[in-house]
Amino acid sequence: MKLCYHNHDFEFEKIDGKNKLDILYDETTPEQLQSEIDTCWARVGGEDPAEYVKKYTGRAPVVHIKDYYGSKSENMYGLIDSGDSDKKEEKTSENSPFEFRPVGYGVQDIASLLKAAEEAGAEAVIVEQDRPSMNKTPMECAKMSIDYIRSL
């Protein structure tokens, strides 16, 4: 069994010039904690997600490949289940410039992310989309992601 930490964008905020996620990994050993890099949130947090995945080679058994369109905004947190039902209701993809997209339909360089995951020794790559978009159903979005990855 491995304990992995799944990031969001706020772990890339800096403390004394170093991002919080790096501090977490510096303060633990790979035996204690592995990374589970979510490439969408890494990019939203200001990092190059492919380079960030490679930074934790040997400590990245799981990598989340996730695409999006738009820019960071306060409303984007309403697109994930934060457990705060009041905020979820008011923050939707209709009023947010940020939107999760099927893989290959957003701003991410998916080929470089897959290559980075392989180079880092990832045992699993998870294709994730928190919410459907582009007026598609969840199954249509999943098929779009699968078809895009197969085209690479």
Where are these regions (language model features)?
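Structural motif corresponding to the early beta-alpha repeats
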Residues: 1-2, 41
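Conserved anion-binding
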Residues: 2-12, 17-20
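Histidine-acidic metal/acid-base catalytic patches
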Residues: 15-37, 41-152
